[in-house]
């Protein structure tokens, strides 16, 4: 079984995340969305809220499951038997950053491959960081996040 992990904070999930996930599904038998718990960052949305949002967005997709994890992402890959890690790439700087991480991950656990999926042009400017800033300033984020997630804000 080809299992992939799509890790992130998803704080909140965006249409760009959804696009990358949907485009990756034909490549794998199962994709685990891994919500990483980062002790150095204060989250905007609770972990439960993020799980609910992701489950609502993908409730009709049997190949996707949502889990949380702490620690090294490659160790979580091993725990869930994922041989692949999906990463979305928006910009050249994303690529440079993700390439460095992928190389470090490969040094730690050589059997886990990083799969880069380039975002569609319409989604390349969307990031959770920008969406959070808009939310903090009472702006309208409807065009940037899936409606199922928006309904849970």
Which role does the model predict for each range below?
Residues 1-153:
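Nucleotidyltransferase catalytic core that binds NTPs
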